[in-house]
Amino acid sequence: MNHFPKLLSSQIGFDVAQTILENFDRHYRIFREAAVEAKDLFERSDWHGLQRLARERITSYDDRVRECVELLEDEYDAENIDHDVWPQIKLHYIGLLTSHRQPECAETFFNSVCCKILHRAYFNNDFIFVRPAISTEYIENDEPAAKPTYRAYYPGSEGLAATLERIVTNFQLNPPFEDLERDIACIMQAIHDEFGAFDEAVNFQIHVLSSLFYRNKTAYIVGRIINGDRVLPFAVPIRHARAGVLALDTVLLRRDQLKIIFSFSHSYFLVDMNVPSAYVQFLRSIMPGKPKAEIYTSVGLQKQGKNLFYRDLLHHLSHSSDRFIIAPGIKGLVMLVFTLPSFPYVFKMIKDHFPPPKETTREQIMDKYLLVKRHDRLGRMADTLEYSSVALPLARLDDALVRELEKEVPSLIEYEGDSLVIKHLYIERRMVPLNLYLQNGSDAEIEHGVREYGNAVKELIQANIFPGDMLYKNFGVTRHGRVVFYDYDEIEYLTDCNVRRVPPPRNDEDEMSGEPWYTVGPHDIFPETYAPFLLGDPRVREHFLAHHADFFDPQLWQDSKDRLLRGELPDFFAYEPALRFCLRYPERFAPGDAAEDGKRAAA
């Protein structure tokens, strides 16, 4: 039944709606300005500036919501607005969005503001946008001189090489390319290596998104090749070959490669989008299995992604019948973890009490999760979605899970009719725990898992992240075979840690003792002591020492810390370094150009 009023008679309803939209427009203007600034920082190789910009943008949304709520309280006494007026506010807001270019994001902003003002009882479609009201189909920016969402190129008229060069130069990056002709030739060879010779159909064309995707030290060109009935995705990473010159680093031509660079374990891109829904639609056309929620999140619109994810969860619950259960595996000391087997995510709650030896607090753990959210995740740390006041149907909760919730997190649950309301939780992608992957894997899988684990930890410490508890159970294996860290309660900055060698035992008694014979400070780490916990399985030990014999050498850890203290930021690649042109086609690189730099970076 529709409870909306037939007449919009409230002036305050229109004023509140307009105020909320004005505040959203301010938020989105700041969001786009960050992407424009990213281009300048990339061109100047200001990597610390890019990191700062990415961190600040993550908290910008909540800042704008808070400002809007404060303004509504000051101007309209929002908490005391008559509840009959709120449906009118929503209708006025819908009217204001009919020609808007980011309506779905504006609806989410409206929800964020209203949920700070209204009681949970009003979180329904009469008052907030439980479902979208404005279609995002076929929105395009038709303002004069505006960039289209994507540009179409037709190689048939000028040849593929010339078209590829025009695609690159149209982005008007300021530093010159070291050798653009060489890089285009590498792309041509890579296309031939991947697809062989293919006949050009009458509709042969290339579509390229009009904005670059910035992250870390890389800017990505993203597009698709249309040939007959085939749609071939591609991404071209642009990097600084050396100071003052650019190079096309490789071309990614497989969907699984693109899915990895847009994965939940990477930090969000900085990309300028006037019509975000059009970008998301384009990206879904080249990664059709990827949920819209994940794509919105990966392009920096994490609140929209979070909103869509929750709608996906509710939709799944209405079309499934299995029950939430305690997550299989080793139970954690700090987090209670449960899952819905038919839904590929886990739900994590901070326990009310932690047994020894854990010495932490709920606030400290939440700070750790926020640290990860704001840090460069490098494809090695799982992103988390944080929710409050989540109502789950009691009938869908396994009895053992309910007992566990009542035992471990009584302060975070509340019964409300037929629902259990969870006051705070985190949601992450479900992965195969690395300890189970190694325990049940073939020899080849064990070697892959061990190599990936060592690479993951080494990349994390290079990025100033010390995982703390490095047992295999705290890492997971993604659908694409990447090893990702997901247990953050003991995480620290490496620069805050003291890397130490184990002092030699003073006597036989020390050597036989099961306890340290040396003092251990709160931030001391001893890499030599990790071996007994990681190398117990002979099969794991063999592969670990073959690929990462230096892992237990304190010098490896100290060298990373020293580089960080000097302000150095290492190179990270969201794709296999072996795909880089300088390594894949070394014969095309003359001595003294980027080839040598590339070999060193990939070493």
Curated annotation (Swiss-Prot):
<dbReference type="GO" id="GO:0004674">
    <property type="term" value="F:protein serine/threonine kinase activity"/>
</dbReference>
<feature type="active site">
    <location>
        <position position="383"/>
    </location>
</feature>
<keyword id="KW-0378">Hydrolase</keyword>
<keyword id="KW-0418">Kinase</keyword>
<dbReference type="InterPro" id="IPR010452">
    <property type="entry name" value="Isocitrate_DH_AceK"/>
</dbReference>
<dbReference type="GO" id="GO:0005737">
    <property type="term" value="C:cytoplasm"/>
</dbReference>
<keyword id="KW-0808">Transferase</keyword>
<dbReference type="Pfam" id="PF06315">
    <property type="entry name" value="AceK_kinase"/>
</dbReference>
<comment type="similarity">
    <text>Belongs to the AceK family.</text>
</comment>
<keyword id="KW-0067">ATP-binding</keyword>
<keyword id="KW-0547">Nucleotide-binding</keyword>
<dbReference type="GO" id="GO:0006097">
    <property type="term" value="P:glyoxylate cycle"/>
</dbReference>
<dbReference type="GO" id="GO:0006099">
    <property type="term" value="P:tricarboxylic acid cycle"/>
</dbReference>
<dbReference type="InterPro" id="IPR046855">
    <property type="entry name" value="AceK_kinase"/>
</dbReference>
<dbReference type="GO" id="GO:0006006">
    <property type="term" value="P:glucose metabolic process"/>
</dbReference>
<feature type="binding site">
    <location>
        <position position="348"/>
    </location>
    <ligand>
        <name>ATP</name>
    </ligand>
</feature>
<keyword id="KW-0329">Glyoxylate bypass</keyword>
<dbReference type="GO" id="GO:0005524">
    <property type="term" value="F:ATP binding"/>
</dbReference>
<protein>
    <recommendedName>
        <fullName>Isocitrate dehydrogenase kinase/phosphatase</fullName>
        <ecNumber>2.7.11.5</ecNumber>
        <ecNumber>3.1.3.-</ecNumber>
    </recommendedName>
</protein>
<keyword id="KW-0963">Cytoplasm</keyword>
<keyword id="KW-0904">Protein phosphatase</keyword>
<feature type="binding site">
    <location>
        <begin position="327"/>
        <end position="333"/>
    </location>
    <ligand>
        <name>ATP</name>
    </ligand>
</feature>
<keyword id="KW-0816">Tricarboxylic acid cycle</keyword>
<comment type="function">
    <text>Bifunctional enzyme which can phosphorylate or dephosphorylate isocitrate dehydrogenase (IDH) on a specific serine residue. This is a regulatory mechanism which enables bacteria to bypass the Krebs cycle via the glyoxylate shunt in response to the source of carbon. When bacteria are grown on glucose, IDH is fully active and unphosphorylated, but when grown on acetate or ethanol, the activity of IDH declines drastically concomitant with its phosphorylation.</text>
</comment>
<dbReference type="GO" id="GO:0016208">
    <property type="term" value="F:AMP binding"/>
</dbReference>
<dbReference type="GO" id="GO:0004721">
    <property type="term" value="F:phosphoprotein phosphatase activity"/>
</dbReference>
<keyword id="KW-0723">Serine/threonine-protein kinase</keyword>
<dbReference type="Pfam" id="PF20423">
    <property type="entry name" value="AceK_regulatory"/>
</dbReference>
<dbReference type="GO" id="GO:0008772">
    <property type="term" value="F:[isocitrate dehydrogenase (NADP+)] kinase activity"/>
</dbReference>
<dbReference type="InterPro" id="IPR046854">
    <property type="entry name" value="AceK_regulatory"/>
</dbReference>
